[in-house]
């Protein structure tokens, strides 16, 4: 692999620790594909990690991970594990979509990829047509899948899909996509281009969102290469009527 190692996530599955990340080829740093590390020890900070290689696709799947693929996340529902990732399609100015598959093992898919969302709206098409950086939070019978859209400048923002926990999560019709972003630039607070979030909990078990954003509106050159992105935290509350997560800079 190359020096391009991106978007690691730590997950605990079936009694072992796993890191899901994306990496480039040593001969082509932009040949980004998803990989897996495994640790069988109780403490992942001092345990031994083993490379499991590139994430495996289902035997009958000819398409997953053939192109630029990254930002994988994993979640569990009703005893099944699911893998969600971003992958580019097309030629020339490619489109980045989100796909989902059920997992056979922590490092191989059981099912053929299913398209979850493409950049349909104008706010997902600024600079580049992008849906990437999926993250999942589960609450009150619903599964909320957030993602990031557009280029990584000040137009970068977060969208969201929602599904019922009892629905077929591999059926695109089970998911409802928000028409507008759920979190975007707030000039009054000096926060620009929020995105690529993850969910965790604080010491008391309250949900927390970790994300990155910029503190300056002016960007010199290509936003992808501009280092002014900072890690930030946000408390998650739930809408009293709908039960959906509320993303507010006040928290």
Q: What feature does the model see in each segment?
A:
Residues 1-251:
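Carbohydrate-active catalytic/glycan-binding domains of CAZyme proteins
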């Amino acid at each position: 692999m190359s020096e391009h190692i991106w978007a690691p996530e730590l997950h605990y599955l079936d009694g072992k620790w796993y890191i899901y990340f994306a990496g480039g080829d040593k001969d082509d740093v932009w040949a980004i594909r998803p990989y897996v590390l495994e640790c069988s020890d109780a403490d992942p900070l001092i345990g031994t990690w083993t490379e499991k290689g590139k994430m495996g696709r289902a035997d009958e799947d000819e398409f997953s991970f053939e192109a630029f693929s990254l930002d994988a996340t994993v979640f569990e529902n009703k005893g099944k594990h699911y893998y969600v990732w971003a992958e580019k399609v097309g030629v020339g100015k490619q489109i980045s979509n989100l796909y989902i598959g059920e997992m056979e093992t922590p490092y191989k898919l059981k099912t053929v990829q299913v398209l979850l969302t493409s950049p349909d709206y104008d706010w997902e098409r600024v600079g580049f047509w992008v849906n990437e950086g999926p993250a999942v939070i589960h609450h009150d019978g619903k599964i909320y899948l957030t993602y990031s859209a557009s280029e990584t400048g000040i137009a970068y923002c977060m969208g969201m899909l929602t599904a019922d926990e009892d629905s077929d999560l591999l059926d695109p019709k089970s998911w409802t996509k928000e028409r507008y972003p759920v979190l975007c630039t707030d000039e009054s607070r000096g926060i620009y281009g929020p995105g690529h979030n993850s969910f965790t909990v604080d010491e008391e078990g309250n949900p927390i969102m970790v994300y990155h954003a910029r503190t300056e509106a002016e960007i010199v050159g290509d936003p992808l290469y501009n280092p002014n992105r900072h890690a930030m935290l946000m408390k998650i509350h739930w809408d009293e009527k709908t039960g959906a997560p509320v993303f507010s800079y006040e928290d």
